[in-house]
UniProtKB/Swiss-Prot annotation:
Family: Belongs to the FPG family.
Protein's name according to its UniProt entry: Formamidopyrimidine-DNA glycosylase
Biological processes, Gene Ontology terms: base-excision repair
Gene designation per UniProt: mutM
Record's keyword terms, sorted: DNA damage, DNA repair, DNA-binding, Glycosidase, Hydrolase, Lyase, Metal-binding, Multifunctional enzyme, Zinc, Zinc-finger
Keyword match Electron transport: no
Length: 264
């Protein structure tokens, strides 16, 4: 699933659409729509300009002329593509005076929602991990009673971090994914806070991680996958100590870690 760095990269590649007017909007698959009639959505979008496109965690929100909001979540395999031919997995097409924007999703876990108000699903998210202060981060971490990997995946704690970057940040901070939040002292919390910011920044600079079929809106792959230190490296030697990387299940998700470098 595209996480914060991948979605941020997509949003940046969509910048040419800001200020452009939507000529037509076609929604071909009701499964990806959330609470909206396709004909009504098309009518509300046609003829209106896109005023801004921003990322909120893993969500994309385009503000539409007249006060509307178009929310998009890429799910597992969703793609937003500028131009190119429409295919069997193309579920929505926005046509502009010049060019098109396609929403492709082979597994159909992504979604599109139009609303006049700011999307409630987005409003319920926690703060951006690179905007929250350390004091607020540490205070909320202390209040939670769970395993640290589970907390990092909880989008009400901080938004946008998923399996890849939780594993990578925990490794850099030297914290075991099954460590209890109640046992993480302030010094280790600081290391984790810094590690989250560092790994997300580096991943954005690299265009994200293209592990399966992720590309940005221009069709470009990311290359941060070549910098992963633990994610999907089960059995390979730790880059710090040569101990084989291990995999455990936390909150029904695979977690990759070094048993020597990461402590509970």
């Amino acid at each position: 699933m595209p996480e914060l760095p991948e979605v941020e990269t997509v949003v940046r590649s969509l910048a040419p659409l800001v200020g452009r007017r939507i000529a037509t909007a076609e929604f071909r698959n009701l499964r990806i729509l959330r609470g909206g009639d396709p004909d009504l959505m098309s009518a509300r979008l046609a003829g209106r300009k896109i005023l801004s496109i921003k990322r909120y965690g893993k969500f994309i929100v385009a503000v539409i002329e007249g006060g509307g909001h178009l929310m998009i979540h890429l799910g597992m395999t969703g793609k937003l593509l500028l131009g190119g031919p429409s295919g069997k997995h193309t579920h929505a097409v926005l046509t502009f005076d010049r060019g098109t924007l396609l929403f492709d999703d082979s597994r159909q876990f992504g979604c599109i929602e139009y609303s006049e108000e700011f999307p409630k699903r987005v409003a319920r998210l926690g703060p951006e991990p690179m905007e929250i202060s350390f004091e607020d981060f540490a205070a909320d971490l202390k209040r939670r009673k769970t395993r640290i990997k589970s907390l990092l995946l909880n989008q009400t704690f901080i938004r946008g971090v998923g399996n890849i970057y939780a594993d990578e940040a925990l490794f850099r901070a030297g914290i075991h994914p099954q460590a209890l939040t109640s046992r993480i002292r302030i010094e280790r919390a600081r290391k984790l806070y810094d590690a989250i910011g560092e790994v997300l920044t580096e991943a954005i600079e690299a265009g994200g991680s293209s592990i399966s079929d992720y590309v940005d809106a221009e069709g470009r792959s990311g290359f941060f996958q070549f910098s992963h230190r633990v994610y999907q490296r089960t059995g390979e030697p730790c880059l710090n100590c040569k101990t084989p990387i291990r995999r455990v299940i936390v909150t029904q998700r695979s977690s990759h870690f070094c048993p020597h470098c990461q402590k509970r």
